[in-house]
């Protein structure tokens, strides 16, 4: 998406649970951008080892980017970034694989 | 080690239909996907219509559909493949209907709309903007109810296994653990979709980085027509929307017309509010307005539905109007901005009408196959192609598998020993920008040469993954495939010194009769 010329740059601090601790990243964004945009920015600009899961990017079709943001279960692709701190955690009721990725495949679609 | 009669790679519509057809023909099938089964491909994102000569809205015949497909293809369709798409389409669409997909109906028959490039009302759909999700869900349910199909997600195929020049299965990595998984198969079907993730502006899922093309190429298969990348002209540009596919304005235009306007709020295509311009023509038209300084603020065009009342909008799109409102958009009061977006790839693996590639026992299905749509795909042909080619590939792969023994495969998969220090996520973003800028809808020799030079310097090595989920390895995997496929597109675009359909050379603007031929690539 292009940037309108007169749009102010905003900043969010994404506090991300990575195993037993949290790691914070300052993420610049434009009004309207999503948590998933922010996470993809972190991977390309700061830390490619950050594990996130998504497939369709922005259409809310694949349903793979579900996570907890500030204690609520949401899709990262439809949750807008807001200035200030946002706390990101993996789904609490699924087996943790890494960082924000949990085991979400139906049991009969996993490698046996 | 996994074993199956038929291995299907990719679980969009083509892969799932192939799995069902192969199982029905007596094979046991392993259906694998790098994402979740039936959720990660292109199909689930399709919000538009499906072209098929079922003749429910007005009399039709598949030969009329074929004539329109060949015309849209600008002289480059493989007529056998186009015919398969058009002739088998009605049977597949009716089978999907029996399976409960829920095609929209009017007065007791399937509703069909008139899409650009078709000579009549031919396109079925599922309301509201739900065609792709409904197709995916229907096939997923059929797959789940077929005990001969084993489904495994989170399994990315890194290489095809070749013995004596024939495909004998594949090597895969289980992404959550990093474990290597060899798969022996009598027949293998690549239903991995296209390559639109190569572009910064794309309507694809993350899985559409051309995996199948790269696998096939490294296995010795031929690719065809790689220069023909379709840009969908009116992909959403601004204001930012979330939770909507950028292709969503297509069904809006089918139903409501709409006016495509430049910065002077004038129509620049001969449409007069009708949705009639072919995709290549509209893409070119928008980019030329932008180049002339008459684009919208974000360098696209305006699209206006301000002629429609709230009631008309709600009748046509129901809950979608609320989702737009949640995004701050009121179509009765404001136009939105649109611009071309990479959407589909006409080229792909070269295959016969039996869907077998040039490597024996390796089949392809869906968008991964090149040729059916020539230089420009007709609206609505993609899902039809996925269903018909998937069904055919599944049947033919099963027929082959019934005749041959289970092959043995070498368990080692051959990763490189070095792990590059680059940030592969950043490199992918760089590649996408490069492709969008120089190998997009408007091309020149200078731009293509610059792109080729940069692409060839990018990292093409793939080390073994670390134990556990290794996101950087996944990016290295994708970068390796995307880089190879990007090189194919760029080299083919550089060699084709003419303009035709989706391939537009600014330095060779004319269509040349001498170029009415295919280019193939093999390594």
PLM regions: where:
Chain B
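Glycine- and aromatic-enriched mobile tails/lids
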Residues: 1-2, 25-27, 36-38, 45, ...
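Core beta-strand elements of the Rossmann-like FAD/NAD(P) dinucleotide-binding domain
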Residues: 2-4, 178-187, 358-359
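N-terminal Rossmann-like FAD-binding beta1-loop-alpha1 element of flavoenzymes
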Residues: 6-31
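Residue-level detector of alpha-helix initiation sites
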Residues: 12-13, 36, 195-196
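Conserved N-terminal glycine-rich FAD pyrophosphate-binding loop of Rossmann-like flavoproteins
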Residues: 35-68, 74, 233-234, 243-245
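Conserved redox-cofactor binding core of oxidoreductases
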Residues: 39, 92-179, 191, 235-239, ...
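Glycine-rich loop(s) and the adjacent beta-strand/alpha-helix scaffold that form part
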Residues: 187-240, 295, 380-396
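An anion/pyrophosphate-binding glycine-rich loop and adjacent beta-alpha core
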Residues: 215, 221-330, 334, 396-403, ...
